[in-house]
């Protein structure tokens, strides 16, 4: 999903209008909705510092707004290549189905381990109904 679509996705998820988001970001009330509309339709791209403010207002990590656009097959393929190179992604075929298996070997003393462990805890809490999908998404999109 591109930055423009992500801004719109998270704005709607928060139940905000373009004017409300733009005003909270700090744009003048007379043009706040226009500026956000320009970001959402892709005619303008927010500068890094503006993107950080938008993320703060939407209560998401700036990283959630800048994740690679994986809807494009080639972009996704190159992302998978990077996962293969850096983390050992393996492909397998079972009949007509292709599987991508990723086993990330994160030892307890590495910075990645607690992040992956807590992700697994949150997935389990979601599966058992201890938290809602919305709470899970709030946690996931808020990670920095």
Residue ranges and their predicted role:
Residues 128-139, 144:
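Short, compact, well-ordered microdomains
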Residues 26-46, 67-71:
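Recognition helix of helix-turn-helix/homeodomain-like DNA-binding domains
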Residues 7, 18-22, 33-39, 54, ...:
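Conserved hydrophobic/aromatic packing and binding residues within compact polymer-binding modules
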């Amino acid at each position: 999903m591109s930055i423009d679509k992500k801004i719109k996705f998270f704005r709607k998820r928060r139940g905000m209008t373009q004017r409300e988001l733009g005003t909270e970001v700090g744009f003048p009330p007379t043009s706040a909705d226009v500026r956000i509309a320009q970001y959402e339709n892709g005619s303008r791209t927010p500068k890094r510092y503006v993107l950080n403010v938008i993320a703060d207002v939407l209560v998401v990590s700036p990283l959630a707004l800048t994740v690679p656009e994986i809807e494009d097959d080639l972009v996704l393929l190159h992302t998978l290549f990077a996962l293969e190179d850096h983390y050992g992604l393996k492909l397998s075929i079972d009949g007509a189905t292709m599987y991508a298996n990723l086993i990330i070997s994160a030892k307890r003393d590495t910075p990645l381990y607690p992040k992956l462990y807590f992700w697994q805890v949150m997935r389990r809490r979601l599966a058992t109904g201890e938290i809602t999908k919305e709470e899970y998404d709030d946690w996931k999109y808020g990670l920095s």
